[in-house]
Amino acid sequence: MSDFLALAQPGVQKLSPYVPGKPVDELARELGIDPAAIVKLASNENPLGASPKALEAIRAELAELTRYPDGNGFELKRKLAERCAVDAAQVTLGNGSNDILDLVARAYLAPGLNAVFSEHAFAVYPIATQAVGAEGRAVKARAWGHDLEAMLAAIDGQTRVVFVANPNNPTGTWFGADALERFLAQVPAEVLVVLDEAYIEYAEGDELPDGLDYLARHPNLLVSRTFSKAYGLASLRVGYALSSKAVADVLNRVRQPFNVNSLALAAACAALDDHDYLAQSRRLNDSGMAQLEDGFHALGLSWIPSKGNFIAVDLARDAGPVYQALLREGVIVRPVAGYGMPTFLRVSIGLPEENDRFLQALGKVLAHD
């Protein structure tokens, strides 16, 4: 029998499959309990559920499931271009923002080239990089966040892409406008900067720099965003990139046909118009973050301040057994040892009662540790 792993290209041989947050149904089967009794705070999902306007748009689209979607996503691109004050030709749609990251890697990376990203950064950066045979350069973090100066120093003549996230997942750390401006000014023009803003909608006012403000001055900048988080459409898989027309043209040369389905296109268009839902999502996230921080303080735990819809808490011990014990309590969070954070758990912000259930379970587990 052929060794099909050995036949794969070397970069793929070194990869391990991405491990997502544990599904509710899987834990329910393992414990033999009703899925409704389980609290999942593992995947940075919106606890409000989808926007009512998005659900209405999905229902209206169901009669057309026999048809292929608009392969160019004309209406969603138009709405995004209007919202973001760019030309529609600067918008690339993806099957989630993960798809955008993969498109970048396939278009710009190859064996002999490299991509730079931070330690403790999103796992898809190295996966996408190694999958095409390129070298991934993980730069040591500073205070759990991006060390932008060190990342600049890691760039060489074979660097084609730099991945930066603001805020970063799973740490929740962020950098300000001055730091971003200095960084962009020093990145060589032939290196594409991918600014991952998956959680930007949770920022209020000028808490975080808006990547769109830098597009016109930096043609090597691509801003990646998603409808999976604040817009509550994670299962539909729809994300997008905003970039120069030249970069968008390149990405569309490798983009799969019909990569965003009709339901996702319709729901995303409607979600963009549901301003009340987005405002409610922000308010819930702010109050939930405060609730968890207060709970961690009461338990004597430290955490990393976060601008996302999640928070990383330091248990000051191997977090693996605590994670397993929480599962037995019917609570799913995210261990992040694979991100070089073995004493941390990442906890998504949930509804008040979900946050309370988690804190009670955590207190119980720690008391018996």
Curated annotation (Swiss-Prot):
Keyword Amino-acid biosynthesis recorded: yes
Cited PANTHER family: HISTIDINOL-PHOSPHATE AMINOTRANSFERASE, HISTIDINOL-PHOSPHATE AMINOTRANSFERASE 2
Domain of life of the organism encoding this protein: Bacteria
Protein name: Histidinol-phosphate aminotransferase 2
Enzyme class per UniProt: transferase
EC number: 2.6.1.9
Native species: Pseudomonas aeruginosa (strain ATCC 15692 / DSM 22644 / CIP 104116 / JCM 14847 / LMG 12228 / 1C / PRS 101 / PAO1)
GO biological process: L-histidine biosynthetic process
Family to which this protein belongs: Belongs to the class-II pyridoxal-phosphate-dependent aminotransferase family. Histidinol-phosphate aminotransferase subfamily.
Pathways involved: Amino-acid biosynthesis; L-histidine biosynthesis; L-histidine from 5-phospho-alpha-D-ribose 1-diphosphate: step 7/9
Modified-residue entries (N6-(pyridoxal phosphate)lysine), positions: 229
Cofactors, names only: pyridoxal 5'-phosphate
Cysteine-cysteine disulfides: none
Gene3D superfamilies: Aspartate Aminotransferase, domain 1, Type I PLP-dependent aspartate aminotransferase-like (Major domain)
Family annotation (NCBIfam families): hisC
SUPFAM superfamilies (alphabetical): PLP-dependent transferases (SSF53383)
